[in-house]
Amino acid sequence: MNAPRFLQLHRPDDAALAAEAAAGLLQPAAAVSPKFLYDALGSRLFDAITELDEYYPTRTEAGIFAAHGEAIAAAVRAATGPAPILVDVGAGDGTKAARLFARLQPRRYVAVDISVDYLRGALACLGREHPGIEMLGLGLDFSAGLALPGGVADEPALVFYPGSSIGNFAPAAARQLIADMRRSSCGGAVLLGVDLVKASSRLEAAYDDALGVTAAFNLNLLRRLNTLLGADFQLRQWQHVALFDAAQSRIEMHLQARVALQVRWAGGERRFEAGERIHTENSYKWTTAGFAALLAEAGFGAQCHWTDPAGDFAVFVAC
Protein backbone atom coordinates (compact mmCIF):
# COMPACT_ATOMS: atom_id res chain seq x y z
CA MET A 1 0.00 0.00 0.00
CA ASN A 2 1.26 3.47 -0.91
CA ALA A 3 0.99 5.98 1.92
CA PRO A 4 -1.53 8.78 1.29
CA ARG A 5 -0.04 12.05 0.06
CA PHE A 6 -1.20 15.45 1.28
CA LEU A 7 -0.96 18.91 -0.22
CA GLN A 8 -2.19 21.99 1.67
CA LEU A 9 -2.97 24.66 -0.92
CA HIS A 10 -5.03 26.88 1.38
CA ARG A 11 -3.54 28.15 4.62
CA PRO A 12 -6.25 29.16 7.09
CA ASP A 13 -5.50 32.65 8.38
CA ASP A 14 -7.19 33.42 11.69
CA ALA A 15 -6.65 37.16 11.26
CA ALA A 16 -8.32 37.14 7.85
CA LEU A 17 -11.17 34.96 9.14
CA ALA A 18 -11.69 37.30 12.08
CA ALA A 19 -11.78 40.33 9.78
CA GLU A 20 -14.30 38.59 7.50
CA ALA A 21 -16.55 37.64 10.43
CA ALA A 22 -16.40 41.13 11.95
CA ALA A 23 -17.26 42.72 8.60
CA GLY A 24 -20.30 40.45 8.35
CA LEU A 25 -21.51 41.41 11.81
CA LEU A 26 -21.26 45.10 10.91
CA GLN A 27 -23.36 44.89 7.73
CA PRO A 28 -26.73 46.70 7.96
CA ALA A 29 -28.33 43.23 8.03
CA ALA A 30 -25.77 41.13 9.90
CA ALA A 31 -24.66 37.99 8.06
CA VAL A 32 -21.84 35.51 8.64
CA SER A 33 -20.61 32.89 6.16
CA PRO A 34 -21.81 29.33 6.85
CA LYS A 35 -18.19 28.16 6.79
CA PHE A 36 -17.96 29.47 10.36
CA LEU A 37 -20.46 26.79 11.41
CA TYR A 38 -17.93 24.02 10.82
CA ASP A 39 -15.37 24.02 13.59
CA ALA A 40 -14.64 20.67 15.27
CA LEU A 41 -17.79 20.75 17.42
CA GLY A 42 -19.92 22.09 14.56
CA SER A 43 -18.81 19.25 12.31
CA ARG A 44 -19.77 16.68 14.96
CA LEU A 45 -23.14 18.35 15.43
CA PHE A 46 -23.76 18.25 11.68
CA ASP A 47 -22.95 14.54 11.65
CA ALA A 48 -25.64 14.12 14.32
CA ILE A 49 -28.10 16.17 12.22
CA THR A 50 -27.76 13.70 9.35
CA GLU A 51 -29.16 10.94 11.59
CA LEU A 52 -32.28 12.83 12.67
CA ASP A 53 -35.74 11.70 11.58
CA GLU A 54 -36.55 15.14 10.17
CA TYR A 55 -33.34 15.41 8.13
CA TYR A 56 -34.17 13.33 5.05
CA PRO A 57 -31.40 14.29 2.53
CA THR A 58 -28.65 11.92 3.73
CA ARG A 59 -30.72 8.75 3.89
CA THR A 60 -32.69 9.63 0.75
CA GLU A 61 -29.52 10.14 -1.28
CA ALA A 62 -28.14 6.85 0.07
CA GLY A 63 -31.36 5.15 -1.03
CA ILE A 64 -30.96 6.49 -4.57
CA PHE A 65 -27.41 5.13 -4.76
CA ALA A 66 -28.60 1.77 -3.42
CA ALA A 67 -31.45 1.55 -5.94
CA HIS A 68 -29.67 2.94 -8.99
CA GLY A 69 -25.98 2.47 -8.24
CA GLU A 70 -25.13 0.42 -11.32
CA ALA A 71 -26.92 2.80 -13.70
CA ILE A 72 -25.16 5.76 -12.09
CA ALA A 73 -21.79 4.01 -12.36
CA ALA A 74 -22.45 3.14 -16.01
CA ALA A 75 -23.21 6.78 -16.82
CA VAL A 76 -19.96 7.81 -15.14
CA ARG A 77 -17.88 5.15 -16.91
CA ALA A 78 -19.31 6.21 -20.27
CA ALA A 79 -17.76 9.64 -19.70
CA THR A 80 -14.54 8.77 -17.87
CA GLY A 81 -13.66 5.29 -19.06
CA PRO A 82 -12.62 2.54 -16.63
CA ALA A 83 -10.63 3.18 -13.44
CA PRO A 84 -11.17 6.95 -13.34
CA ILE A 85 -9.68 9.52 -11.02
CA LEU A 86 -12.30 10.32 -8.36
CA VAL A 87 -12.22 13.89 -7.00
CA ASP A 88 -14.32 14.19 -3.84
CA VAL A 89 -15.19 17.84 -3.11
CA GLY A 90 -15.85 18.56 0.56
CA ALA A 91 -14.76 15.01 1.32
CA GLY A 92 -14.96 14.97 5.11
CA ASP A 93 -14.39 11.38 6.22
CA GLY A 94 -14.73 10.05 2.67
CA THR A 95 -17.46 7.52 3.49
CA LYS A 96 -19.81 8.61 0.69
CA ALA A 97 -17.11 8.38 -1.97
CA ALA A 98 -15.95 5.02 -0.61
CA ARG A 99 -19.36 3.57 -1.49
CA LEU A 100 -18.50 4.22 -5.15
CA PHE A 101 -15.18 2.37 -5.07
CA ALA A 102 -16.55 -1.11 -5.74
CA ARG A 103 -18.41 -0.10 -8.90
CA LEU A 104 -16.02 2.53 -10.29
CA GLN A 105 -12.67 1.00 -9.26
CA PRO A 106 -10.91 4.40 -9.30
CA ARG A 107 -7.15 4.33 -9.69
CA ARG A 108 -6.77 7.55 -7.67
CA TYR A 109 -8.95 9.09 -4.96
CA VAL A 110 -8.49 12.84 -4.45
CA ALA A 111 -10.14 14.07 -1.24
CA VAL A 112 -10.63 17.86 -1.17
CA ASP A 113 -11.42 19.73 2.04
CA ILE A 114 -10.44 23.04 3.56
CA SER A 115 -7.70 21.44 5.67
CA VAL A 116 -5.70 18.27 5.16
CA ASP A 117 -5.84 17.81 8.93
CA TYR A 118 -9.48 16.75 8.45
CA LEU A 119 -8.39 14.17 5.89
CA ARG A 120 -5.40 12.40 7.41
CA GLY A 121 -7.22 9.83 9.52
CA ALA A 122 -9.84 9.16 6.86
CA LEU A 123 -7.31 8.56 4.08
CA ALA A 124 -5.13 6.38 6.29
CA CYS A 125 -8.16 4.18 6.99
CA LEU A 126 -9.34 4.14 3.36
CA GLY A 127 -5.80 3.36 2.19
CA ARG A 128 -5.68 0.27 4.40
CA GLU A 129 -9.10 -0.88 3.16
CA HIS A 130 -8.34 -0.16 -0.52
CA PRO A 131 -4.59 -0.65 -1.03
CA GLY A 132 -4.91 -0.58 -4.83
CA ILE A 133 -6.18 3.01 -4.91
CA GLU A 134 -3.75 5.92 -4.78
CA MET A 135 -4.86 8.35 -2.03
CA LEU A 136 -4.29 12.11 -2.22
CA GLY A 137 -5.59 14.74 0.21
CA LEU A 138 -5.87 18.38 -0.91
CA GLY A 139 -6.36 21.27 1.51
CA LEU A 140 -8.30 23.75 -0.60
CA ASP A 141 -10.98 26.39 0.09
CA PHE A 142 -13.17 25.64 -2.92
CA SER A 143 -15.92 28.04 -1.81
CA ALA A 144 -14.05 30.78 -3.68
CA GLY A 145 -13.41 28.57 -6.73
CA LEU A 146 -12.18 25.06 -7.51
CA ALA A 147 -8.81 24.88 -9.26
CA LEU A 148 -6.80 21.68 -8.95
CA PRO A 149 -3.01 21.74 -9.26
CA GLY A 150 -1.40 20.21 -12.32
CA GLY A 151 -1.02 16.44 -12.32
CA VAL A 152 -3.89 15.80 -9.91
CA ALA A 153 -6.58 15.13 -12.52
CA ASP A 154 -4.84 15.27 -15.90
CA GLU A 155 -7.19 12.83 -17.62
CA PRO A 156 -10.99 12.37 -17.62
CA ALA A 157 -12.08 12.29 -13.98
CA LEU A 158 -15.25 12.17 -11.90
CA VAL A 159 -15.86 15.19 -9.67
CA PHE A 160 -18.16 14.11 -6.83
CA TYR A 161 -20.16 16.61 -4.74
CA PRO A 162 -22.89 14.77 -2.82
CA GLY A 163 -25.27 15.65 -0.03
CA SER A 164 -27.01 18.71 -1.52
CA SER A 165 -24.09 20.96 -0.54
CA ILE A 166 -24.45 22.73 -3.88
CA GLY A 167 -27.56 24.27 -2.31
CA ASN A 168 -25.39 26.39 -0.01
CA PHE A 169 -24.46 28.48 -3.06
CA ALA A 170 -26.71 31.09 -4.65
CA PRO A 171 -27.58 30.15 -8.26
CA ALA A 172 -24.90 32.31 -9.90
CA ALA A 173 -22.21 31.04 -7.52
CA ALA A 174 -23.43 27.45 -7.96
CA ARG A 175 -23.19 27.82 -11.74
CA GLN A 176 -19.60 29.07 -11.41
CA LEU A 177 -18.60 26.26 -9.06
CA ILE A 178 -20.11 23.66 -11.40
CA ALA A 179 -18.22 25.25 -14.32
CA ASP A 180 -15.04 24.92 -12.22
CA MET A 181 -15.90 21.27 -11.62
CA ARG A 182 -16.37 20.76 -15.35
CA ARG A 183 -12.89 22.14 -16.03
CA SER A 184 -11.42 20.07 -13.21
CA SER A 185 -12.99 16.89 -14.61
CA CYS A 186 -10.76 17.20 -17.70
CA GLY A 187 -13.51 16.05 -20.03
CA GLY A 188 -14.98 13.56 -17.56
CA ALA A 189 -18.13 13.92 -15.48
CA VAL A 190 -19.63 15.42 -12.34
CA LEU A 191 -21.88 13.59 -9.90
CA LEU A 192 -23.97 15.83 -7.64
CA GLY A 193 -26.67 15.47 -5.00
CA VAL A 194 -29.53 17.98 -5.20
CA ASP A 195 -32.31 18.64 -2.69
CA LEU A 196 -35.63 19.27 -4.43
CA VAL A 197 -38.45 21.71 -3.70
CA LYS A 198 -41.16 20.31 -1.42
CA ALA A 199 -43.67 21.44 1.20
CA SER A 200 -42.27 24.27 3.32
CA SER A 201 -43.33 22.46 6.50
CA ARG A 202 -41.03 19.53 5.71
CA LEU A 203 -38.16 21.80 4.73
CA GLU A 204 -38.44 23.88 7.88
CA ALA A 205 -38.66 20.78 10.08
CA ALA A 206 -35.47 19.42 8.48
CA TYR A 207 -33.64 22.58 9.57
CA ASP A 208 -35.35 22.99 12.96
CA ASP A 209 -35.62 19.52 14.47
CA ALA A 210 -37.53 18.61 17.62
CA LEU A 211 -34.38 17.57 19.51
CA GLY A 212 -32.77 20.95 18.92
CA VAL A 213 -29.60 19.57 17.34
CA THR A 214 -29.75 22.02 14.42
CA ALA A 215 -30.35 24.84 16.89
CA ALA A 216 -27.19 23.81 18.76
CA PHE A 217 -25.30 23.62 15.45
CA ASN A 218 -26.34 27.18 14.59
CA LEU A 219 -25.75 28.60 18.09
CA ASN A 220 -22.28 27.04 18.11
CA LEU A 221 -21.37 29.67 15.50
CA LEU A 222 -21.53 32.28 18.29
CA ARG A 223 -19.16 30.18 20.37
CA ARG A 224 -16.81 30.09 17.39
CA LEU A 225 -17.03 33.89 17.03
CA ASN A 226 -16.28 34.34 20.73
CA THR A 227 -13.06 32.39 20.24
CA LEU A 228 -12.11 33.89 16.89
CA LEU A 229 -12.95 37.53 17.66
CA GLY A 230 -12.70 37.62 21.43
CA ALA A 231 -16.42 38.49 21.36
CA ASP A 232 -18.85 38.30 24.28
CA PHE A 233 -21.89 36.65 22.72
CA GLN A 234 -24.12 35.08 25.40
CA LEU A 235 -25.64 32.05 23.72
CA ARG A 236 -28.78 32.01 25.89
CA GLN A 237 -29.67 35.47 24.55
CA TRP A 238 -30.12 34.06 21.05
CA GLN A 239 -32.45 31.60 19.37
CA HIS A 240 -32.27 29.55 16.18
CA VAL A 241 -34.68 30.44 13.37
CA ALA A 242 -35.23 28.44 10.15
CA LEU A 243 -37.66 29.59 7.47
CA PHE A 244 -38.39 28.90 3.81
CA ASP A 245 -38.30 31.84 1.40
CA ALA A 246 -40.51 30.62 -1.44
CA ALA A 247 -39.63 33.55 -3.70
CA GLN A 248 -35.94 32.58 -3.65
CA SER A 249 -36.57 28.84 -3.21
CA ARG A 250 -34.28 28.60 -0.23
CA ILE A 251 -34.22 27.68 3.44
CA GLU A 252 -32.62 30.40 5.55
CA MET A 253 -31.03 29.92 8.95
CA HIS A 254 -30.73 32.86 11.32
CA LEU A 255 -29.79 33.59 14.91
CA GLN A 256 -32.31 35.96 16.48
CA ALA A 257 -31.70 38.14 19.54
CA ARG A 258 -34.17 37.34 22.33
CA VAL A 259 -33.59 40.74 23.97
CA ALA A 260 -31.91 44.02 23.08
CA LEU A 261 -28.18 43.56 23.65
CA GLN A 262 -24.71 44.88 22.90
CA VAL A 263 -21.97 42.60 21.56
CA ARG A 264 -18.33 43.63 21.81
CA TRP A 265 -15.19 42.16 20.32
CA ALA A 266 -11.60 43.22 19.82
CA GLY A 267 -11.82 46.32 17.63
CA GLY A 268 -15.59 46.50 17.29
CA GLU A 269 -19.08 46.27 18.72
CA ARG A 270 -22.71 46.21 17.64
CA ARG A 271 -26.07 46.70 19.25
CA PHE A 272 -28.81 44.22 18.34
CA GLU A 273 -32.43 45.02 19.04
CA ALA A 274 -34.79 42.30 20.27
CA GLY A 275 -35.81 40.24 17.24
CA GLU A 276 -32.85 41.36 15.11
CA ARG A 277 -31.10 38.54 13.28
CA ILE A 278 -27.74 37.31 12.08
CA HIS A 279 -28.14 35.42 8.78
CA THR A 280 -25.96 32.29 8.96
CA GLU A 281 -26.86 29.98 6.07
CA ASN A 282 -28.93 29.50 2.93
CA SER A 283 -29.86 26.18 1.36
CA TYR A 284 -31.36 26.55 -2.12
CA LYS A 285 -33.87 23.95 -3.30
CA TRP A 286 -34.25 23.04 -6.96
CA THR A 287 -36.64 21.41 -9.39
CA THR A 288 -35.06 18.77 -11.64
CA ALA A 289 -35.75 20.98 -14.68
CA GLY A 290 -34.23 24.02 -13.00
CA PHE A 291 -31.06 22.18 -12.01
CA ALA A 292 -30.74 20.62 -15.47
CA ALA A 293 -30.85 24.15 -16.90
CA LEU A 294 -28.14 25.23 -14.44
CA LEU A 295 -25.90 22.37 -15.59
CA ALA A 296 -26.43 23.40 -19.21
CA GLU A 297 -25.52 27.00 -18.35
CA ALA A 298 -22.32 25.71 -16.73
CA GLY A 299 -21.34 24.05 -20.01
CA PHE A 300 -22.57 20.46 -19.73
CA GLY A 301 -24.11 19.03 -22.88
CA ALA A 302 -25.27 15.64 -21.59
CA GLN A 303 -26.88 14.77 -18.29
CA CYS A 304 -29.16 12.29 -16.56
CA HIS A 305 -30.67 12.07 -13.11
CA TRP A 306 -32.36 9.71 -10.66
CA THR A 307 -34.77 10.49 -7.83
CA ASP A 308 -36.32 8.66 -4.90
CA PRO A 309 -39.96 7.51 -5.32
CA ALA A 310 -41.28 10.55 -3.43
CA GLY A 311 -39.28 13.00 -5.53
CA ASP A 312 -37.56 14.54 -2.51
CA PHE A 313 -33.98 14.36 -3.79
CA ALA A 314 -32.07 13.86 -7.04
CA VAL A 315 -28.66 12.59 -8.09
CA PHE A 316 -27.33 14.08 -11.34
CA VAL A 317 -24.54 12.88 -13.64
CA ALA A 318 -23.40 15.43 -16.23
CA CYS A 319 -20.63 15.31 -18.80
Functional labels for PLM-detected ranges:
Residues 29-76:
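Class I SAM-dependent methyltransferase Rossmann-like catalytic core
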Residues 81-92:
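Conserved class I S-adenosyl-L-methionine
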